[in-house]
Amino acid sequence: MRSIVKRILVTCAATTALALLLTMVLCALGNAMAPKWQVEPFTDHITLTTTNTAIQAVDPATGAVLKTPQEGAYRTKETHITVALDGGKTVNAIVREPLDAPADRPACLFLHGSGTGKSSEAFGDVANAMASAGITTLVPDKRLDNYTMLHRDYVSSAHDYAKSLEILRKWPGVSRSETGIYAESEGTWIATVLTQQHPDLAFAILTSPPVVSGRQQMTLAATNYLTAAGAPDAVKQLIPRITSLGTQRMGLAYADFDAAKYRRSLTMPLLINYGVKDTAMPVEQGARLLIKAANQAGNTNVTLRYYDANHQLRTGSNQTVPGLPLEPHYTHDLEDWINAVTSGTGANGWATPMIAGTQPNQTVTAPLKTPPALVKSMGVIVGAIAVC
């Protein structure tokens, strides 16, 4: 009997010791798998002096406000064209131009974000409004045969957009030296490649730009989404474990697009626009990074506007849904800014503040570095699951 009890006690002791050892190993492994960084609060807020987003320049000849064509000044004409790309590919495009406007006028090429692709379904209201203020616009289709959820090549996309840029620069009535670009969201990454390749662009407008890499932006967006959904902190703390994992083996190399490298090419007059209801973008941090990069490149002609609007600068919902109206001042501000900078307005030539609008409130910081822990690749996890 004693021997049986003894064996039971020994077995229990061994089992307990083994359980403790396994617990310690699993705890150590869990700690090793956790990145040494977390999402931090954002505190470097931008202070605005006025909620008025109006943009006006000073006429150097008179000292008064520069008079430029206003929205609705011209009737517009729409022309559907085909743009030839490399490899025998083509995309459709729409040119909108002001009728009876003076020659040598400004022009603007539009670059799609991730949510749009067809020229017939995107930017129609913005592009037509610009045209009515004397600015010729070109909206091409996004090339989609090499654009998927797993593969996106922003450098190649910039090369494709350059074909449309050349057509626009040669369009009748357009001044080549007064032609610039307008990009939204994901398209702003492509825009910075285009500004590097074409530093002679007259201007660049970046609306709702992520600024940081896709991996870094997604960390911020996921944190804000889970916070809004009421997720506990323990769940939100899992985000760095996921977003730090390498994705190249799965084809998601574009998540690590070198945004910092390309934003140094913003040497031309720059307009940055954000909707303060956009929680997916680093609305204050991104603006500071862009202004810093432009300034370091010798460009101080940077205007920043914040609107009481969503990611698409539309009102009526914080979410991106079809059919919403644009923020009522938005297109007017775009046109006034383009007409001013193409008239020669420099950093010291503005009659209105260079930073204005609705006060933003970015709550968390998009991490600028996301080093992984022990497990470095999403492919390792996928492979382990497959084996199991």
Please tell me what each predicted stretch does.
Residues 44-103:
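N-terminal cap/lid segment of alpha/beta-hydrolase-fold proteins
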Residues 167-226:
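Primarily recognizes the serine-hydrolase "nucleophile elbow" in alpha/beta-hydrolase
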Residues 127-147:
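Conserved alpha/beta-hydrolase
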Residues 6, 300, 309-312, 316-388:
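Alpha/beta-hydrolase-fold serine-hydrolase catalytic core, especially in secreted/extracellular enzymes
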